[in-house]
A protein has these predicted regions:
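Conserved helix-loop functional segments at active or binding sites
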Residues: 330-341, 367, 395, 399-407, ...
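Short pre-active-site segment immediately N-terminal to the catalytic Zn-binding motif
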Residues: 319, 370-390
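A well-structured
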Residues: 1-314, 325, 600
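Post-HEXXH active-site segment of zinc metalloproteases
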Residues: 388, 399-423
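Post-HExxH zinc-binding segment in Zn-dependent metallohydrolases
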Residues: 413-442, 450-452, 456, 530
Length: 600
């Protein structure tokens, strides 16, 4: 057996594969000096308190000064967070992050007056400010975003009470997280050789991918039998969460918790319902995929613990990082040379922290900002790793374009559009790979890779969204969220989504208890809408060429300058209709048909 590759210390990683934090601050001492300097922004804010409605010049002067402050504070945060993530065990950078957090709390408190004061300026007066000071036009979007919440903003005294209550609002999620991640323990299981295997939240999916059905079944039962024994506790967490959301929605004069959550990012409630309806209308594609999985696994009975097992062996070789970059550049060529030039700049100028090292934060992410985005990877030289590079650089270039083309107040895009650029890159990559292979096995592997991603992102997240809607409606009717009600509904949804081709094991009724996303307040549906929008955009780019690419770049450059629905319309996608979701689901169905032919 080959020896396991040793994970290097941070100091042992080749510099060219580390991100250039020196572009933010050349030394830690300069960061410390900048933090001291940033403390002046707190008295600066206090000097403007009570004066924002005084004159056009005062309002403009404050907004400009706040932009400058936010840029400098953003650099401070970027450096401290990136350095901490390089080695999470490094006490020096953990202390630096602690200093940053203390400063951010004080800074946020100092600026708490801004929203109420801007809302308090009457419309005629603000219109007059705009005419007197044309430079305020730059802040029109920011001001309108704040002022559109006027109907949901309370009196000063009531807002103080809401702020105090807000300190408790995270408690259900935090208690649930501590229970799931720190307190709960699952019985060990054993493999065919009698070796003990530990079941944890982290090891669960790898165990579900195990080739031995007995290992999968044992892990499945270990996980869900344990959650079943605590189901009344976990139901109480969610019941408390829903009561918190209902309190906030009613206090702010919303008709429902769904409306309150979506109004914050200017997404119409109908978008949520359209997604669920479109998935329901196309559920036969998922049923067909389940039946294909059953056939390819060669089993008489497919179970819920069989859904993660690979059904096509990995036909691809190892893909080293340097080779992966070249493939990605070719795959994204339809986006034009200007896009590729920025991508190459990111590859060459150390925007990316590539390889795993001792203590490095796990996973992958992109962080936008000045002077350029930063991307964290834990590269493994696999197909999955190549898709991760394409995905995270999609985020990075979205941030790059937004910051380049928008003033600071409009540069940040909302979550509803955040996954579009990253997923668009993934779709272009899989299409390129499929167009450049004649090997049936490799083609089947690539298609299955995409289908699994699609199933997990569109179908699964929509099922979660539907369950979340059920919980909110039940709670809003005045009914407590009991464990039995949650288990019954969750089991019913699994039966509907997966169909008759699978045995829906009774244990799956407990799965809701291990899903942290149900504390995220109508968040997960955006994964499904973002994936669907990306599929539609990638298809336009590949079929319509330059016109579609030009539209897509308008989307990338729009930042937060409009509401998210309008921004997606720039790229030719209207998420107020079911069309983009239907188009994506049609693609899923077509790929299943091709998969069947390849595996016949």
């Amino acid at each position: 057996m080959a020896a396991q590759k040793k994970i290097p210390k941070r100091s042992e990683v080749d510099k060219q594969y580390t991100w250039a934090t020196e572009d933010l601050f050349a030394t830690d001492e300069l960061w410390e000096k900048a933090l001291e300097d940033a403390k002046k922004y707190i008295p600066m804010a206090e000097a403007y308190k009570g004066r924002l409605g005084e004159s056009a010049d005062t309002l403009y002067g404050f907004l400009k000064a706040r932009d400058e402050a936010n840029l400098k504070i953003g650099r401070l945060a970027n450096y401290a967070m990136r350095k901490s993530d390089e080695d999470t065990a490094n006490s020096f950078y953990n202390a630096m992050k602690g200093k940053l957090m203390s400063y951010l709390v004080a800074n946020e408190s100092a600026y708490a007056f801004v929203t109420p004061e801007i809302i308090a300026i009457d419309d005629a007066k603000l219109d007059g400010f705009m005419q007197q000071k044309p430079e305020l036009k730059e802040y029109e979007r920011l001001l309108s975003r704040i002022r559109r919440m006027k109907a949901h903003t309370l009196s000063d005294a009531e807002e103080r009470i809401m702020a105090l209550a807000g300190q408790m609002s995270n408690a259900p999620g935090e208690i649930g997280s501590a229970f799931r991640n720190a307190d709960i323990r699952f019985p060990d299981i054993h493999d065919a050789e009698g070796n003990a295997l530990q079941v944890t939240q982290g090891s669960f999916i790898p165990l579900m991918e195990n080739g031995d059905v007995n290992v999968r079944k044992a892990a499945f039962e270990s996980m869900y039998h344990t959650f079943a024994s605590f189901k009344h506790t976990t139901a109480a967490f969610l019941d408390a969460q829903m009561k918190t959301l209902i309190f906030n929605a009613q206090a702010r004069h919303y008709d429902s918790t769904l409306e309150a959550a979506l109004d914050e990012t200017e997404v119409p409630v109908q978008v949520y319902h359209n997604l669920i309806e479109a998935v329901h209308n196309n559920i036969e594609h998922l049923h067909k995929y389940v039946n294909l999985r059953k056939k390819l696994m060669g089993v008489d009975e497919l179970h819920m613990y069989d859904l993660y097992t690979p059904i096509v062996s990995n036909a691809t070789k190892k893909i080293p990082y340097e080779e992966a970059k070249e493939i990605i550049l070719k795959a994204l060529a339809p986006l034009g040379q200007d896009y590729l030039d920025i991508l190459k700049e990111g590859f060459s100028n150390r925007w990316i922290d590539v390889y795993e090292n001792e203590g490095k934060r796990s996973g992958a992410y992109s962080s936008g900002g000045d002077p350029h985005p930063y991307v964290l990877l834990n590269q493994q030289d696999t197909l999955d790793s190549m898709f991760t590079i394409a995905h995270e650089m999609g985020h990075a270039l979205h941030s790059y374009h937004s910051i380049k083309h928008q003033p600071p107040c409009n540069a940040h895009y909302v979550i509803f559009v955040a996954e579009v650029a990253s997923t668009c890159n993934e779709v272009l990559l899989v299409k390129y790979l499929l167009n450049n292979t004649t090997d049936k096995r490799e083609r089947a592997y690539l298609i299955n890779h995409f289908l699994e991603s699609f199933r997990g992102t569109v179908y699964r997240q929509t099922m979660f969204a539907e369950f979340e809607l059920f919980m909110s409606r039940l709670a809003e009717s005045g009914t407590a969220l009991t464990a039995d009600a949650l288990c019954d509904k969750y089991y019913e949804l699994n039966k509907f989504y997966f169909g008759d081709g699978i045995t829906v094991d009774k244990e799956i009724a407990e799965e809701w208890a291990r899903i942290p996303h149900f504390f995220y307040n109508f968040y997960v549906f955006q994964y499904a809408t973002g994936f669907s929008a990306a599929c539609a955009i990638a298809n336009r780019i590949l079929t319509e060429g330059e016109t579609a690419v030009a539209d897509y770049k308008k989307f990338l450059s729009a930042g937060g300058s409009m509401d998210p629905i309008s921004i997606l319309k720039l790229a030719g996608v209207d998420m107020t209709t079911a069309a983009p979701v239907n188009e994506a689901l049609k693609l899923f169905g077509e790929l299943i048909d091709e998969m069947e032919e390849l595996m016949a």
